[in-house]
Amino acid sequence: MKKINILVPDLPESISDATVVKWHKKIGDTVHCDDNIVDIETDKVMLEVSSPCDGILQSILEKEGKVVISQQTLGEINKSTVVDNHLSNNHIIEKEDNLLKKEEKYITTEEKKEIEYLLKDNHKHLTPSMRRSVKIHNINNGFLNQVIETSKKTNFENIIKEEKKESNQILFNHNIFNANENNKNNNNKVTNRVKMTRLRQRIAERLLDSKNNTAMLTTFHEVNMKPIILLRKKYGEDFEKKHNVRIGFMSFFVKAVIQALKNFPEINAYIDQTDIVFYKNFDISIAISTPRGLITPVIRNADTMTMAEIEKKIKDFSIKGLQNKINIKELMGGNFTITNGGVFGSLMSTPIINPPQTAILGMHVIQERPVVVNGQIKILPMMYLALSYDHRLIDGKESVGFLINIKNILEDFNRIAIDV
């Protein structure tokens, strides 16, 4: 048998190393090409390391908790063309998925070579987990082509109904331990020590760095959300039927922010030593809460996207975030961040800048309250807006003007159409 190394994937320049989180196979286990063998965690995302071939797991060189670098050998596989189940430690359990009965199309022996060819030919279109699912469920070539085409538009797992257990495997129980079970101090306090994930450590470092290295200030305003609420109520059903996605509030804010950034270019910029660098593009980071912590994937060139495209992108980020499948590249860059504490019920907050960006907009809960309009008291659905910014680059005049610009657009969205 030929030994094949299991390697750490190439990591971006901004990522120096990763931590081995969980081995899904033991030494002696049978592995198949594209099986998820081990999970590793970087400062930003969780990565699945898949088997490069069929064979038997020969050795584990880097155990859970070890720090590894790009292209480092994690373990070795004894490659074989045919894997005998009696040679491995694996127990074979047959499962029946009722959801797949109508969609699964079983292949014949003659079709297997064609399927392998299609998988290889479409390697760049399918992630390891996608290729693994195709093999597990014996999808035939016609259905595979349908999956490849459709997966460009929607979530792959929704098409072939892949078992949900896989997306819930990484729960980080390995990172949780009790330093001393029922450890008690002099005051009889019971404690439980929990090790921080790498993502949480990185978040802590970046937040502290932001506070210590920026002259951060927060300005507040409020916006009447009734026009947007009525707009969603009037066109929401037609929008969903046409675009197959619900229209939320975030796409309105993305559009409003882009227009405001065009009017206040110093907010779409950053400081590089003694220079101010102005962005020409509009890459908007959207804060998303995941089981591992807060991440900010980037909607690139958002100014060229429709409302539907923005909503689909946000939905895709949310699904991938919950499944720990956000790609590293999707988190890199970004000129300006929008965060919505309102989904948790936050009435007001002071969001922290996401360096090297110079500003972040905080959305909050929509709450009906009395407001004086033209000398009359009205009950309106109001939202507080918060703009945290680096005072080294942005003055109070620009920050207030930026918020008022967003407020005016949201209260009269027709401004977007006529560019005012």
Swiss-Prot record:
It comes from the Bacteria. It holds the Pfam family Biotin_lipoyl. The keyword Transferase applies. It catalyses: N(6)-[(R)-dihydrolipoyl]-L-lysyl-[protein] + succinyl-CoA = N(6)-[(R)-S(8)-succinyldihydrolipoyl]-L-lysyl-[protein] + CoA. The modification N6-lipoyllysine is found at residue 44. Binds 1 lipoyl cofactor covalently. Pathway: Amino-acid degradation; L-lysine degradation via saccharopine pathway; glutaryl-CoA from L-lysine: step 6/6. One of its GO terms (biological process) is L-lysine catabolic process to acetyl-CoA via saccharopine. It is an enzyme of class 2 (transferase). Its cofactor is (R)-lipoate. Its EC number is 2.3.1.61. PROSITE patterns: BIOTINYL_LIPOYL. Disulfide bonds: none annotated. InterPro entries: 2-oxoacid_dehydrogenase, 2-oxoacid_DH_actylTfrase, Biotin_lipoyl, CAT-like_dom_sf, Single_hybrid_motif, SucB. E2 component of the 2-oxoglutarate dehydrogenase (OGDH) complex which catalyzes the second step in the conversion of 2-oxoglutarate to succinyl-CoA and CO(2). Forms a 24-polypeptide structural core with octahedral symmetry. Part of the 2-oxoglutarate dehydrogenase (OGDH) complex composed of E1 (2-oxoglutarate dehydrogenase), E2 (dihydrolipoamide succinyltransferase) and E3 (dihydrolipoamide dehydrogenase); the complex contains multiple copies of the three enzymatic components (E1, E2 and E3). This is Dihydrolipoyllysine-residue succinyltransferase component of 2-oxoglutarate dehydrogenase complex. It comes from Buchnera aphidicola subsp. Acyrthosiphon pisum (strain APS) (Acyrthosiphon pisum symbiotic bacterium).
